[in-house]
Amino acid sequence: MISFSSFYRQIADTQLQHWLESLPAILGEWQRQHKHGNLPKWEKVLAKLHYPAPEFLDLKDSVTIGDGLQLDSGQTEKLENLLKILQPWRKGPFHVHGIHIDTEWRSDWKWDRVSPHLSPLTNRTVLDVGCGSGYHMWRMLGAGAKRVVGIDPSALFLCQFEAIKRLIDTELPVHLLPLGIEELPPLDAFDTVFSMGVLYHRRSPIDHLLQLRDQLRMGGELVLETLVVDGDKDTVLVPQDRYGKMNNVWFLPSIDALKLWLEKCDFTDVRCVNVDVTSLAEQRSTPWMQNESLVDYLDPKDVNLTVEGYPAPKRATFIAVKNRSPQDAD
């Protein structure tokens, strides 16, 4: 069973220590109630990941573990077969002892778009909401973050993250909790909070922005990336049924509308720093993710539209600063 004891130990004397009053019970309940049928199989994979500490590690420019020379061919083949049990791999890529985990998303491209606009992460305590398997968390650590906490309710993402962590160093200050943000007690403690690819999945986007705000310290930085549409401050697309075959897409605002939402939630210095149409090269099926992908979600006759006739995915990244505490604002 995956243990969170290292996380509890590491936050005991930090600004996150108040979580110790409630998170052990919340995560204990998750462990008791989570009944995903594949979890025992995935945990068996984790139990077999006994490999020497990597002699080479790059988290600054990629997520590369080992130089490809440390393991013999038999060890490498065994490791690759174990990691393939954890498919589908959606966020990455990862380079593990010469094995290229070619994930569905080129998450490194997103990081390259976002990272130049961030306040330096050096010595910052960071929260990554909807972190997936944790690719960006490793890049945050590589950028100098003091501590990185990611949250995502998926058991598979948790196991993928744990696999990578066990191949690097289990005591590094980077942790994934299998929770949604609505389960986190407000903390007002993080220096930087990321929410990338989450807002459009929320039934109440304003509540999500307030939940993000409640995790930030005063003056802390929010990094928000989400799907947007063209239009003015009054433009919001609400898909009638599905969007790109997804039935959990609720609100796609215009850039100006989202800026207004952020300001309404007491964020200041709101800036849209990047707008990018998702390309077929950035999101696609691979041997490590063999399900449908972006090409299957777009109109085969016009890639500027989804199969439902909505505008194709366009993503905007915003940076904003928490201006007031919840007590002052609400």
UniProtKB/Swiss-Prot annotation:
SUPFAM superfamilies: S-adenosyl-L-methionine-dependent methyltransferases. One of its GO terms (biological process) is tRNA wobble uridine modification. It catalyses: carboxy-S-adenosyl-L-methionine + 5-hydroxyuridine(34) in tRNA = 5-carboxymethoxyuridine(34) in tRNA + S-adenosyl-L-homocysteine + H(+). The keyword Kinase does not apply. It is an enzyme of class 2 (transferase). The keyword Transferase applies. Carboxy-S-adenosyl-L-methionine binds at residues 91, 105, 110, 130, 152-154, 181-182, 196, 200, 315. Keywords: Transferase, tRNA processing. One of its GO terms (molecular function) is methyltransferase activity. It holds the Pfam family Methyltransf_9. Its EC number is 2.5.1.-. Homotetramer. Catalyzes carboxymethyl transfer from carboxy-S-adenosyl-L-methionine (Cx-SAM) to 5-hydroxyuridine (ho5U) to form 5-carboxymethoxyuridine (cmo5U) at position 34 in tRNAs. PANTHER family: METHYLTRANSFERASE, TRNA U34 CARBOXYMETHYLTRANSFERASE. Belongs to the class I-like SAM-binding methyltransferase superfamily. CmoB family. This is tRNA U34 carboxymethyltransferase. The gene is cmoB.
